[in-house]
């Protein structure tokens, strides 16, 4: 963990800590992986807390990684593995766009997220 406890992942940044905790709450259902969340948070802490672009970029990066693993598994006929990775990718995209304010950028994320990254 970057510098806080399991609950207060980003000391002094309640929004990021709370959003991370909400995401971690999905772990018992296989919707996220704690190790992946920890890696995201380590990268965020290294970039400096509070930058909403960093938040989106780091969560999106992990989502894209899972999406690529899902695509690969699907091609190989490993449907359960693919579905696990697609589920995690979706939750990471969802978590990443959490702090993008309403407007053109958020709309672009929904239309074509790759144009925003």
Which functions belong to the PLM regions below?
Residues 1-55:
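Long, non-catalytic architectural segments outside compact domain cores
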Residues 38-45, 64, 88, 92:
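Amphipathic, alpha-helical segments enriched in basic
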Residues 50-57, 76, 80:
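Short, solvent-exposed segments of well-ordered alpha helices
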Residues 59-63:
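Short amphipathic alpha-helical heptad-repeat segments
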Residues 67, 71-74, 81:
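Hydrophobic/aromatic side-chain positions at a characteristic register within alpha-helices
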Residues 79, 83-110:
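Short, charge-rich amphipathic alpha-helical segments embedded
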Residues 116-117:
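Conserved small/polar residues in nucleotide/adenosyl-binding loops
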């Amino acid at each position: 963990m970057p510098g806080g406890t399991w609950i207060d992942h980003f000391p002094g940044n309640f929004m990021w800590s709370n959003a991370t905790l909400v995401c971690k709450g999905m772990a018992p259902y296989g919707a996220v992986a704690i190790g992946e969340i920890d890696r995201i948070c380590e990268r965020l802490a290294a970039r400096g807390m509070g930058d909403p672009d960093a938040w989106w970029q780091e969560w999106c990066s992990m989502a894209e990684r899972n999406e690529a693993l899902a695509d690969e598994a699907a091609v190989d006929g490993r449907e359960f593995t693919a579905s696990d990775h697609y589920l995690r990718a979706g939750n990471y995209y969802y978590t990443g766009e959490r702090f993008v304010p309403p407007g053109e950028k958020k709309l672009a994320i929904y239309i074509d997220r790759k144009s925003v990254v």
